[in-house]
Amino acid sequence: LADQKKQNFFSKEELNLILSVYGKGISSGKWKDYAIDSSIKETIFSIYKHASEMPIYRIIKNHKSRRTDERWAIKSTSGQIIKRNKNLSYLLNYFKEKDFRLIN
């Protein structure tokens, strides 16, 4: 077991940034659930509008990318890359542009 490759994941700081944005989506009533998946190639934080649906967003940390600008990505339900960047904070600004007003 000691010879197996270390499983990649989000760092504590990365997860805190993602959960901060996720919390705003939850507070606004736009998002309902999330899931975290990890492999040797990538770690994915999936955001769901309803638990029984496909994720509406996937925040992806690419562990095997040769290009630095492909380290982080946001993908839509269809798998289209919405935004890509080497910096997670900059990438998450995409969600700050979204309207997270509270729903009455």
What do these predicted regions represent?
Residues 1-44:
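Negatively charged, low-complexity tracts enriched in Asp/Glu with abundant Ser/Thr
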Residues 3, 54-81, 97:
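Short aromatic-glycine-(Arg/Gly/Cys) micro-motifs in beta-strand/loop hairpins
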Residues 16-17, 28, 68, 74-76, ...:
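Intrinsic structural disorder
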Residues 1-6, 81-104:
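Mixed-charge, Lys/Arg-enriched low-complexity segments
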